[in-house]
Every structure is written in C-alpha cells, then in structure tokens.
Amino acid sequence: MAEGFAANRQWIGPEEAEELLDFDKATQMNEEGPLNPGVNPFRVPAVTEADKQEYCKILQPRLQEIRNEIQEVKLEEGNAGKMKKKRQRRRRKKKAFKKMMTDLEDRFRKLFGSPSKDEYTEIEIEEDPPKKEKRVDWDEYWDPEEIERMLMD
C-alpha cells in the first residue's frame, strides 16, 4: 500500500502525520472544546519507528483529508489578501474621485456662481443680491453605484 502512495507522491510519512494529527487535535479542541481531544499515537513515549510506519498505513485516508483541509484554508487565506487590496484600491479611487469632483465644483462656482463686479452692480440695481448658493449635491446628478462601476473598470 505504501508503494502506491509513494509512486503518486501522496504518501504521508510519520513526521508529517504527527504534525497533521496535532493540527487536527488543535482544530477539534477549538471547535468542540477541550473535553476529549484524543491522543496523537505518534506522541506516545514508547512508540517505535515500525509502529509509526504501521500507524501511517492505517491512518492514510484520514491524513489525506486533514492535508486537503489545510490546503483549502491556505487557498482561502490567499484570496483574503487579494480582496483586501481590491478594497484599498476602491477606497483610493473613491477618494480621488471625491477630490476631483470638489475641485470641479469650485471651478464651476468661480466661473458661473459669482458674477463679475460690473454685472453684480447691474443685478443689484434690478434685483436683490443673489442668496448664497448651496453646495451642489452630486448624488442627485450621479448614481454613486454607477460612478463606482466606472472607477472599478
């Protein structure tokens, strides 16, 4: 049986088996509590090398399951960092867009919001001076989700 695993590079030896069972025991204690965590047969004081090899043969299916669980967790952790980078990039783009929009708003206010002195005098004669303009709320003109989609592309 060991020859078949060795040919496929899937055979788990005593050292790795000991670590995998320690991981399984720690996971079990974390999820179910420390009442009955079980015993790692590789850590029994009087175990011989032949006994360890025998345990490896017997426990191969369970050891393979534990190894696959660990690999899945590593894959999920790798993706977590990727999502964090995406969130940071999205925040930077939103911040840059917000700054750009406030700059544009200030420019428009300077261009169209405050009349020149000559026009102001004429307007003052005809009507009351214009009231202070409210700051433009761009959410009314732009859909924030649409802007976010444009920025993320």
Curated annotation (Swiss-Prot):
Q: Which GO terms describe its molecular function?
A: RNA binding
Q: Where is this region: Disordered?
A: 24-43, 78-97
Q: Subcellular localization, per the record?
A: Host nucleus, Host nucleolus; Host cytoplasm
Q: Where is this motif: Nuclear localization signal and RNA-binding (RRE)?
A: 84-95
Gene Ontology annotations for the cellular component aspect, listed alphabetically? host cell cytoplasm; host cell nucleolus
Matching entries from InterPro entries are given as: Envelope_glycop_lentivirus
Q: What is its main location?
A: host cell
One matching Pfam family: Env-gp36
Q: Which GO terms describe its biological process?
A: mRNA transport
State the function annotated in the UniProt record.
Escorts unspliced or incompletely spliced viral pre-mRNAs (late transcripts) out of the nucleus of infected cells. These pre-mRNAs carry a recognition sequence called Rev responsive element (RRE) located in the env gene, that is not present in fully spliced viral mRNAs (early transcripts). This function is essential since most viral proteins are translated from unspliced or partially spliced pre-mRNAs which cannot exit the nucleus by the pathway used by fully processed cellular mRNAs.
Can you state the subunit structure given in the record?
Answer: Homomultimer; when bound to the RRE. Multimeric assembly is essential for activity.
Protein name, please?
Answer: Probable protein Rev
Originating organism: Feline immunodeficiency virus (strain San Diego) (FIV)
Taxonomic placement: Viruses, Riboviria, Pararnavirae, Artverviricota, Revtraviricetes
